């Protein structure tokens, strides 16, 4: 499902533990780390996609988390030219993402990145909130910055309570 401008709808997930750290996952077979994310299927709401992706990529059911916040609108990133598949139709030039911040309610031992037969991650760790901005691939960095800036007041206000 690609929109008229060539962007694929997608959800991004920032999962927080009680200490305010965020879930940071290593892409399988690569030295590349990111937040969980995934496409929104036809006739699926962003929230439905969020919970499907959370189960597929992190192994957590909806009751294991609480949605703390969602971005007000779509955040977009464009793929580098070398990653665009010009032979596919329609051509996907990037992702438009609805981001969600989740609070982990379950024990972290329930996290399972090999829940499906085709896992996306082969490792994970908790990192400080702003750490991902210096580590994520450059073409996703501005979207991460915008989502994290929007969510920071919510997270840090919760920590003060």
Curated annotation (Swiss-Prot):
Indicate which residues form the motif Nudix box: 38-59
According to the UniProt entry, the coiled-coil residues are none
UniProt keyword annotations, A-Z: Hydrolase
Give every Nudix hydrolase domain span. Answer: 6-149
Q: Which Gene3D superfamilies match?
A: Nucleoside Triphosphate Pyrophosphohydrolase
Entry-linked NCBIfam families: PRK00714.1-1, PRK00714.1-4, PRK00714.1-5
Give the HAMAP family listed for this entry. Nudix_RppH
PANTHER family (UniProt xref): GDP-MANNOSE MANNOSYL HYDROLASE, MUTT_NUDIX FAMILY PROTEIN
- What name has this protein been given in UniProt? RNA pyrophosphohydrolase
Q: Which organism is it from?
A: Hahella chejuensis (strain KCTC 2396)
């Amino acid at each position: 499902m690609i929109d008229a401008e060539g962007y694929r709808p997608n959800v991004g997930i920032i999962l927080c533990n009680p200490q305010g750290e965020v879930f940071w996952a290593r892409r399988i077979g690569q030295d590349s780390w990111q937040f969980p994310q995934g496409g929104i299927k036809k006739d699926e709401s962003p929230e439905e996609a969020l919970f499907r992706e959370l189960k597929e990529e992190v192994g957590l059911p909806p009751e294991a988390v609480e949605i703390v916040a969602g971005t007000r609108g779509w955040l977009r990133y464009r793929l580098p030219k070398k990653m665009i598949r010009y032979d596919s139709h329609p051509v996907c030039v990037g992702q438009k993402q609805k981001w969600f911040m989740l609070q982990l309610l379950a024990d972290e031992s329930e996290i399972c990145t090999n829940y499906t037969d085709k896992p996306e991650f082969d490792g994970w760790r908790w990192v400080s909130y702003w750490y991902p901005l210096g580590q994520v691939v450059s073409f996703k960095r501005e979207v991460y910055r915008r989502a994290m800036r929007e969510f920071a007041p919510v997270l840090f206000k919760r920590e003060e309570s």
